[in-house]
Amino acid sequence: MTETRPGPKPRISILVPTPLLITEITEPAAHRNRSSHESDVLMHPGGQGLWVARMAGSLGADVSVSGPFGGELGSLIRTMLDGLGMQVNAVRYGYGNGGYVYDLRGEDRETVAHMPPPELSRHELDDLYGTAFVDALASDVLTVTGAEPGDVVPASFFGRLIRDTRDAGTTVVADLSGKPALAAVAANVDVLKISHEEVLDLELVAEDTAEALVSAGHMLLERGAGAVVISRAKDPALLVEKDSVREVSAPSITPLAHRGAADSMTAGISVGLARGFDLVEAVALGASAGALNVARRGLGTGNRTTIEKFAREITVRTLS
């Protein structure tokens, strides 16, 4: 892997269509016997885009996020992001942000409450587009993440932003699924990161064998993507380019959590490209970030030095 040299921080601009407030109820770190309901209550900024942003920051990037913020939850999320040192390009959100409350005291994560955010209005979409586009022009890489629920932002929005940003000369990495993923491909996104489950949802192939997924990757290249990275949970990821197919694998790690690897991988790819790595090196950095994130408590968290050292242990094997 290319060694990181001292110099200006790589700048990553991240589109975050649905910033969320995540509240978790856990067993108390220390029992003080002060209440029959004694528990720890933790609050975090969350959602796909903010988890990508946290990992990009952990990897030493100068991170800015563009998204809608409003209502009581929006104010809390912005304050938390300020504390993490992120630049927040906030668009006014009339109805306000959504969030989750999870109970982690049992063996499985239990959803206690879910407040889904409403779709953005026409004027809010216009403001978000302009804010994200202008910020991307001052960045090394624009990373585009999806909305949850999907109807908050229309698929055409992603395609327009990606096309215009690429035409202006900024590299674009997209971590999208469904119609937004296809819109990104049609807009000639530089790198599409997508999971094997999401590939199946596109109905390009009927099974998730490596051969079928590679075939789907080539279909996405034919439709306009520059490269496709397919994550496969515990199995090696696939990097599909026009003239090559590579398998990217990490040493086995016992996970503490099964969520967060894909978002961390996207962050690593984005930071690698922003540093000037070639795509194979960037994907190796992403694979390292993703593998180590599941060995930690906290989505999108990681240690830069550890991730960069572990990236040397990532195996990249050429399949064709």
List the model feature ranges, each with a label:
Residues 156-172, 176-243:
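Conserved phosphate/ATP/ADP-binding segment of small-molecule kinases
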Residues 112-113, 139-147, 175, 193-196:
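Short beta-strands and strand-loop turn motifs
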Residues 1-66, 75-79, 249, 320:
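Glycine-rich phosphate/adenosyl-contacting loop at the front of the ribokinase-like
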Residues 54, 99-103, 236-239:
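Short beta-strand scaffold segments in enzyme catalytic cores
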Residues 119-165, 171:
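Hydrophobic alpha-helical segments and helix pairs
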Residues 32-34, 39, 58-141, 309-320:
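Conserved N-terminal subdomain of the carbohydrate kinase-like
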